[in-house]
Amino acid sequence: SDVYKRQILLMEKGERIDLSLFSGGTVLNKGNVCIHFDSSKSVKYEQVHGAPAKVEYNTIIVPRKGEYQLILADGSKVFLNSESKLRFPTRFEGKERRVYLEGEGYFEVAKDSMKPFIVEAKEVDVRVLGTRFNVNAYTPDKVIRTTLVSGKVQVSDRTSEEIAVLVPGQQVVWQSGHFSTREVNVSAFTAWIDGKFYFEEGATLVEITEQLQRWYDIDFIFSSERVKQFVFAGMIKKEYTANEIFSIIEKTTQVVHFNVSGRVVTVSEIK
């Protein structure tokens, strides 16, 4: 499908590789690392033994309407959501495995008790030994959510050094320097990997449209502040068109209307 057409791999020296140009079975040799492209829209890094030791950083950039997965040199798997970026070393050296996330990523971390795996997301470090978790750190939100599926993670604020430790089924929310922890339905926050939107109880139209604009590459205008706060809850497949989703929300709430004009959608209240 066309969602995979625009992913870019940025090499350390500025070389840009359009990931849509590679079909399954392609292998790129880059010094000390082999990059395998496979047909499921994912890329895998593999260390070449005996190669020179320089560690380089690559960045995968996923645009609106896109998703991508990669397997890092240690075997850890990362799923990246639309409008997200991951900067990572081509192989892990030293005492830790550190990657840098903008946007949203779901991580299945390979166990290595000697080398903690750290996701740096804006003001927060998420530190793990081996686990499955989701980090949501989109820039406009000013909120960073870490949701733990299995294992154990420690989340810390790099400035205040405040720390939160999660057990499976918990989510920690970072907002302006402080953490709050709550029990959540984990599958709700990882639904995007299974091709679904999940709008939890009490989700406002502002929060919902933020997800929709990244996936459908559209922009929303609200006719009033009041409309922004209307709520809708439910699980909807991402294979639906934007118009089908608007129609579901209209029928369910019976108080809002979506008016589509090209890539701009106006959301108004039905008086």
Identify the role of each PLM range.
Residues 1-271:
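A residue-level detector for the "anchor" residue at the start of short, highly conserved motifs
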